[in-house]
Amino acid sequence: MFTGIITGVGRISAVQALGESTTHGKRLTIEAPVGYLDDVGLGDSIALNGACMTVTTFSVEKGEFTIDISAESLDKTSGLDNEGPVNLEKALRAHDRLGGHIVSGHVDGIGHVTRFEQVGESWDLRVMAPPALGKYLAY
């Protein structure tokens, strides 16, 4: 579980194919901020741009970790298939403060942005979600 609050910004520094086909997914290497991986272990969950991923290797010394992402997850997310910046959030622990919301980080469907407009110092964002997901949305 996650709060949905970004705790660091990393950088996807390498993208490798898993297998000979794009249907096998990809392995991403992520450079993390200094000290970010100090309490991370193999198999821990870290959300990348809000999507829950599993740490497959990590190096505190190098400040980087890898995740293997399936073709399905690549299809249902954005910003995870090319090198560049990525938002990071470590999974909650039982004793952590809930400073945001409780979210799973699991993708249940794809929405489409229908409006993105600045209103004063805020932004009005409207997303059209598949009807089957309506029962899970608060609005």
Give the label of every model feature segment.
Residues 1-139:
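Conserved loop->alpha-helix
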